[in-house]
C-alpha cells in the first residue's frame, strides 16, 4: 500500500505507461464503457454528477480494492504485441488457478496511469513496462462484486469457420 499512499500524496495522474484506449473512443465501445461505469457508480450509490465521489471510487484501484494480495505484471519495454498477448494469457492462467483455489481476482489496467510511481516505489527498472496490476483474495461482501456487465452475443464478435 506504499504505492497508494504515494499516489495520493502526488494526487495527479502520472505519465502513462501506455495508452489503453484511444483518445476518441468510438461506438459501440464508448457506450459500453459508460454503461459499466454508470452501473458501478449506481452500486456504490454515487450520482453521475458527483465527480469527487467518482474519483474516490476510482482511486480504490490503487489500494487493490482492499485485497490482501496485489500483483504487478511487467515486461521489457522493447517486446512487441505478441509478448503483450503472452502476459495476458499468463494473467488468465493465474486467474483460473486462483479461482480453483477459492480465490477471486481483479485484473487492473488502471495501474498504467501511475507507472513511474510503481517503478519508483518498487524499484523496477525503467527498461520494464507495467502491463497491469491484479488484486487477489477471498471475495468480500462488496457492492462492486455484484456487478455483472452486459455481454454482446457471441455471433456479434466471432466467426466460426469449418
Residue ranges and their predicted role:
Residues 1-12:
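Single conserved hydrophobic/aromatic residue that forms the stacking wall/gate
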Residues 5-6, 77-78, 140:
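Short, charged/polar surface micro-motifs in flexible loops or helix N-caps
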Residues 13, 17, 22-32, 129-162:
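C-terminal helix-cap and adjacent tail motif
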Residues 26-73:
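Alpha-helix-centered segments that form part of catalytic cores
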Residues 55-58, 118-121, 143:
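Glycine-rich, charged/polar anion/phosphate-binding loops
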Residues 66-68, 126-130:
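Short coil/turn connectors at secondary-structure junctions
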Residues 67-121:
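Small-aliphatic-rich amphipathic alpha-helix that forms the alpha element of a beta-alpha
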Residues 119-126, 146-148:
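Short proline/glycine-enriched turn/loop segments at secondary-structure junctions
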Amino acid at each position: 500500500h506504499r504505492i497508494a499512499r504515494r499516489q495520493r500524496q502526488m494526487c495527479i495522474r502520472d505519465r502513462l505507461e501506455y495508452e489503453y484506449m484511444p483518445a476518441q473512443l468510438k461506438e459501440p465501445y464508448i457506450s459500453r464503457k459508460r454503461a459499466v461505469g454508470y452501473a458501478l457508480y449506481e452500486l456504490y450509490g454515487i450520482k453521475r454528477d458527483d465527480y469527487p465521489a467518482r474519483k474516490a471510487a476510482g482511486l480504490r484501484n490503487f489500494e487493490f480494492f482492499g485485497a490482501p494480495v496485489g500483483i504487478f505484471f511487467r515486461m521489457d519495454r522493447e517486446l512487441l504485441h505478441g509478448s503483450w498477448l503472452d502476459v495476458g494469457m499468463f494473467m488468465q492462467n493465474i486467474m483460473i488457478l486462483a479461482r480453483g483455489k477459492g480465490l477471486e481476482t481483479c485484473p487492473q489496467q488502471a495501474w498504467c496511469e501511475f507507472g513511474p510511481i510503481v517503478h519508483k516505489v518498487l524499484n523496477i527498472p525503467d527498461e520494464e513496462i507495467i502491463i497491469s496490476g491484479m488484486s487477489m483474495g477471498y471475495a468480500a461482501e462488496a457492492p462492486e462484486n455484484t456487478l455483472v456487465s452486459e455481454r454482446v452475443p457471441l455471433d456479434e464478435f466471432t466467426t466460426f469457420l469449418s
